[in-house]
């Protein structure tokens, strides 16, 4: 088994020539390699809808974790229910932070997402994902190279130093148009905020619509020197 510790033995390669640009092959390999020791960390963005559909074909009982920060858009919570109905056999886990919003405010002040967004992300996303990955050998992410400068070198299989794990990214070669084409072709549910200028949807407090010509991460933590929550630093 390929693990963080045995990374030097990595000789895995995949063809990008099929209709999913290698995504199904990558997922098939991942679930064969890690069996029940892999989880998909899903934010329920539009890429997530594609991956959930593909994962359901490969492993209908796969584990899916959603990092419920308690400050997501209502539309996101409604979408999760639709996904549960569409893919009832998937094991969707809504992971909560240890601190409630009130407890966080008492310790760090109100509106931590404004005063210290990095700490807020650590408490409400990074630490919960660390806990979710503690007993896993690998995790799946919907990163695409086209999304931003910070993601353009992502590979199918990555040694993830942040979580000391293997990060599997099946959609790296997909374009934004291809993602939507797949969603429409398979009549997949998606967050209606995508239709009103939100290409990337995170917490309600830190996500704004993106103007024409911006990249998909421009609406995240707008006005701050920050485009990632910290989950995807290598």
Swiss-Prot record:
A single GO molecular function term of this UniProt record: phosphoadenylyl-sulfate reductase (thioredoxin) activity
One BP annotation, GO: sulfate assimilation, phosphoadenylyl sulfate reduction by phosphoadenylyl-sulfate reductase (thioredoxin)
Active site (record annotation): 229
Main EC class the enzyme belongs to: oxidoreductase
Record note on cofactor: Binds 1 [4Fe-4S] cluster per subunit.
GO CC annotation: cytoplasm
Coiled coil (residue ranges): none
Taxonomic superkingdom: Bacteria
Residues that hold [4Fe-4S] cluster according to the record: 120-121, 203, 206
SS bond list: none
Pathway given in the UniProt record: Sulfur metabolism; hydrogen sulfide biosynthesis; sulfite from sulfate
Record EC number: 1.8.4.10
Assigned protein family: Belongs to the PAPS reductase family. CysH subfamily.
Function: Catalyzes the formation of sulfite from adenosine 5'-phosphosulfate (APS) using thioredoxin as an electron donor.
Protein name: Adenosine 5'-phosphosulfate reductase
Species: Bacillus cereus (strain 03BB102)
Gene: cysH
